[in-house]
Amino acid sequence: MPADELNHSLSWIVVVGDVFGRPGRKALSLGLEKISSQRRVVFTVINGENLAGGKGVNTKTAQECFDMGVSVITTGNHLFDQKGVIDLLQKDGKVLRPLNYSSLCPGVGSGIYVLDNGLRVGVLNLIGRVFMAPSDCPFHAADQVLSGWSDQGISPDLVLVDFHGEASGEKRAMGFHLDGRVAAMYGTHTHVQTNDLEQLPGGSWYLTDVGLSGPHWSVIGVAPEMALSKYRTHVPAPFTVGEGELLFCALLLGISSTSNGVRIEKAELFREVFP
């Protein structure tokens, strides 16, 4: 089947990595608009820990993304950098916090979302422990949720896992740990899209990092002059979001439903720079 014909025959899940500040939200809007004009998008998940000024998420920025068609927002280490986020976490389960934070932490780190076509998509939001602040074991946390869904007879049609981590080795290990039990495991946090999208031996799709959506000419979102000043002088510099051209990075998952279940037929990286 020709590529264009296959693209139109599938339903698509759009996975967007760290959306950085106002430029990231604009890039998100432009990117989703372009993808939706070419494919039938049924579900969109983004990492929103940098939505508000590059640090954290608040009600205004989250709602702006939901108005664009975003289904679920995952987060990471900057989750609590904005006021009012606890109310957001306790609202409706559409903004997740890292699953392997303390059980006393407000909000939830996983959810099952029912689409208009009846498809049930599970999302897990994990955070790494290598070169990151202390947290509970992400491997055990993932096992608990997946086995819990299975024991209750509510396992979703497919599961997506956002592993928000610094170390590629830790992400890779999680990929193999979950292989065959989830549809896709992808990394966020480093803001650099990696070129290692592949299907693991057990059938799960894996990507080390989806990449940044935000200012293209920046140091992972920050204005270059600010980042350079800090690196060269060791003197803390004001945190300033970069400007100019917009970069949009995403992972696209084309899914089909048959009598044998739901499966990912096609996975591809998407990267575009908007003027």
Each model region followed by its residue ranges:
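Acidic, metal/ion-coordinating pockets
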Residues: 2-275
